[in-house]
Amino acid sequence: MLFLACECPYLDELDRAQLRKTTSSHLTADMLTGLWQCYYPMYVGNVEFKEVRMFSSGKADIIMEDVGGSAYYAETFKWRWDGNYITFTKGNTTYQFQVTDCIFPELFLSDSRRKYPWAWRRPEDCIK
């Protein structure tokens, strides 16, 4: 994936914010809305999370791929932030990740299996 420079009014603020290390207790749901993408393969159960778009309405679209690459698809989940954990639920399926570190706009998540680095991805109108 290639990111090129673009003119977005809040990019300077994001650049300054990126230098600020914070704890999960300083994160708000508003800071979590938007499009997130995993730096490295994020295998959760039998799927790989590719990216997650979290909406302020409490819904999240998760783009995932079956392990082995046999299917690539998106599913809509409900999401919530309790100050320590991001939880995605759909029917009987629940994914829960603890925010172990944050250097905004980067998040580091973990579950019982491993740690996952995520990074903020710019809005589509800033991606060329």
Regions found by a protein language model. Name each.
Residues E7-A74, R80-K128:
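Lipid interaction determinants
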Residues L2-A5:
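C-terminal motif of bacterial Sec signal peptides marking the signal peptidase cleavage site
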